[in-house]
Each structure stands twice: as structure tokens, then as C-alpha cells.
Amino acid sequence: MFKYFPTNYVWNLSVNLAIEMGARIGEIEEMCAPLQEAAKAPDAAGTQAFRATWAAMADKLCELAQEDEARGRLLSAGEKYGRAAAYYITCERLQAHGAPGRLALYERCLEVFSKGLRLAGDNCERVEIPYEGKVLSALYVRAQGVDGRAAPGRSPLLVQINGLDSTKEMKYRVGLPAWLARRGVSSLIVDQPGTGEALRLHGLTARYDTEHWASRVVDWLETRADVDPKRIGMEGVSLGGYYCPRAVAMEPRFACGVAWGANHDWRDVQKRRLEKEGSFPVPHYWSHVQWVWGAKDIDDFMRIAEDVHLDGVVEKIRVPFLVTHGERDSQIPLKWAHRTYDQLVNSPKRELKIFTDREGGVQHASFDNSINAGQYIADWVAETLQGRTA
């Protein structure tokens, strides 16, 4: 794990995530060098300072991209807009719920990200899935054939979902959809209830019965002529290590599942966090989880969290399932990966992969070095859904 700030895990997590999304080390230095003292400040003051330097860098990249556009250099402009979006979302996710300007910052990220995709000509399309009278926004990435072009006919697809505080743009830029596309597998990266646009723009909060929205996603995929409905899998990162196994257990149309970071008993994690055990993923943690889950107060949240566990659930999974975990995860103890794996008694192909110092990706959901872990997952999915690995 790259520890730019010696005493601030949350900020180091954010820097590492940004690097995984394509941040440049010179820009990291320019943004972070003025923040050494702010990193020691209370959450409110510190996160405002973090936002100021990171948003300024994103603004500068957008100005440079506009200069590229004016000269007809659209590919370069698209790359800069994409990197700017990564910096916007990095500082947005650290802000407190309701912080002045947070929503505008998020909307700016969406705008810049979309422009970056278009100008760069990326294999990525924004789509919307009807849900509860609103929509779940998602990014659709098409499988590639061996010649690098869009694969003909119906392709296997992996639905990819967020954790507690990630967004579809973050997951896209980390790289799993591109790695899958090269292996002949399409991707649908979803802002499910409690995350991204669903939470910020539509007020859709998280729910423990994830099959409620996951089934609607499968319904939508079954209408597409380029998706093989018999080869739809799901992957979840971080808290998605709860969301995904639950959905795969309860929605029989999923053909496989992957937990990128196990999260078997999130209710227990909350109890430990109340006792100051384990690392927090974001500042303002308790107000953040209440917002995500639509809780009135901390007591209401703890009641909601009582349902967020996989005991009695994982046994219902009857398709291949991969559980991965970082050996040095300081947010979610490794024991929960073993618990999920041990309860996958009815899966015809279960696997537990623990990432060690040798491979890298030892931190929570491999945020410290995602490429080896992510490509391991991509290979497993391709093998399971009949894509290709060569």
C-alpha cells in the first residue's frame, strides 16, 4: 500500500484508488504535497482541503483537454477528461453527505467522464435500467472478438456492482471491464441502490435483499440480442462481497458469482467499528452509512445492519463461485472469506483465492494493486462463462 500520508488510512486508500484509476504520480505529488498538515486535521476541515487541491487538478486537466479539442486532438482530450473524472470522484467520495457543493461536484464528474468516453472512442456506453419508477444507471462494455472488434452474436456478461462507497465510473477505470472484453466477456457496471447515481440523484437507498434489484437487471439483460442469457454472472467488490453472494443465491438466473473482497457478516463489522476496531473506508463514516441505508439514526442503522449477513444464504448458491480476499485487509477480517467459502457447500465449483505479498493486492479489495487480482478474476470468469484466456 502506498502511504503518502503517514497517519491517515482513509486518505491513503483514496490515493491508492486514484492510482488504480489511472492517476499520474506527478499529479498525485502536486495534489498531495500541500495536504500534509490537513491530513492530521478533523474530518470536516481535512476533506475540504483535499477537495480543493484535487478538484483544482481536475479543473486544470479539463482546461488542457479543451485546448486539445480546439486543435482537433480529440483522443488526447478524451484521455484528460477521463483522468479528470477520476480526480473529481476521488475527492467527492470523501465529502460528508450534504456538504455544500458535493452534488455539483458529482454531476461535474459524470459530465466529464461521459465526454471523455465519447472523445476517446472507448468501448463503453451509458445505459439505464427501469427500476421502481426510476432508473438504475449503468455502463455497458461489449465483448471483443479475437480481432479486437465487437464480438458477433450473443456473448457472456458479468454484472459488476459497487461496494459501500464506490461508483460505476471508479470500477470502470480500475480496468476489469476492459480485461473481460479482451477475454470475450461483456460487462454491465451498475450503480445499484445505495451507490452512485441511484443514491445521489434518485434517492434509492441500499437494501439487504439485493435480489430485488438484481433480478430487474437480469430482466433487462434478457432483452438484449447481444447477451447470452444463460451466461450472465455477477461480481461485487468490498460490500459487494455481501451484495453479490446474496443476489446469486436468490436469483437462479445468474450463472456464476465473484466476491472481490469477502463481506460475509457486515453486521459484525459494524459492531466492531463501534468499538473502534478496523479501518474505516471514508471520513464521516457513521453519517455516510446512515445515508446509504436510509437510516434515521445510528440505532436505526444498527437494526438494518442485523440483516446484512450471509449465514443461511450462501448455502443456496448452486453455481460456480469465486471468493477472493487480500491477506492484509484491515477493513474486513480474512476469517469472513473462509466463512463464505466454507458455506458454499452446494456450489459445483467453489474457489477461495487469498492474495499474498507475492501477487500483490493484499489490501481491502486489492485497492493497493488491482491488476494481478483483477486479471485473476477475469480469467476465472472467462473460463467459467466460456470466454477465452488466450
Place the predicted regions along the sequence by residue:
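N-terminal cap/lid segment of alpha/beta-hydrolase-fold proteins
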Residues: 52-54, 58, 104-153
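Primarily recognizes the serine-hydrolase "nucleophile elbow" in alpha/beta-hydrolase
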Residues: 89, 220-275
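Catalytic active-site module of serine/aspartate enzymes centered on a nucleophile-bearing elbow/loop
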Residues: 367-390
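Mobile cap/lid helix-loop segments that gate and shape the active-site cleft of serine hydrolases
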Residues: 273-313
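Short alpha-helix in the alpha/beta-hydrolase fold that links the catalytic acid
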Residues: 319, 333-343
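Alpha/beta-hydrolase active-site loop
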Residues: 204-226
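Short beta-strand/loop motif that positions the catalytic acidic residue
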Residues: 317, 323-325, 329
